[in-house]
UniProtKB/Swiss-Prot annotation:
Subcellular localization: Spore core
Cellular-component GO terms for this entry: endospore-forming forespore
Gene from which this protein is expressed: sspO
Main localization category: other
Keywords of this entry: Sporulation
UniProt organism field: Bacillus cereus (strain ATCC 14579 / DSM 31 / CCUG 7414 / JCM 2152 / NBRC 15305 / NCIMB 9373 / NCTC 2599 / NRRL B-3711)
HAMAP family in the cross-refs: SspO
An example Gene Ontology biological process: sporulation resulting in formation of a cellular spore
Residue ranges with Polar residues bias: 8-20
Protein name: Small, acid-soluble spore protein O
Induction trigger: Expressed only in the forespore compartment of sporulating cells.
Disordered, as annotated region: 1-49
Similarity field: Belongs to the SspO family.
Length: 49
């Protein structure tokens, strides 16, 4: 049968991106300021996490 490889990683791709860590995406949007509505929502969600 050969060696079993983890099914969620795609060979030839960046391992991190294959596991849902879209690095570029996160870095791009991480520092964008919230609108007042988003800021309000963010506070509530933080408590629940």
């Amino acid at each position: 049968m050969g060696k079993r490889k983890a099914n969620h990683t795609i060979s030839g791709m960046n391992a991190a991106s294959a596991q849902g860590q879209g690095t570029g995406y996160n870095e791009e949007f991480a520092n964008e300021p919230f609108t007042p509505a988003e800021r309000q929502n963010n506070k509530k969600r933080k408590k629940n996490q």
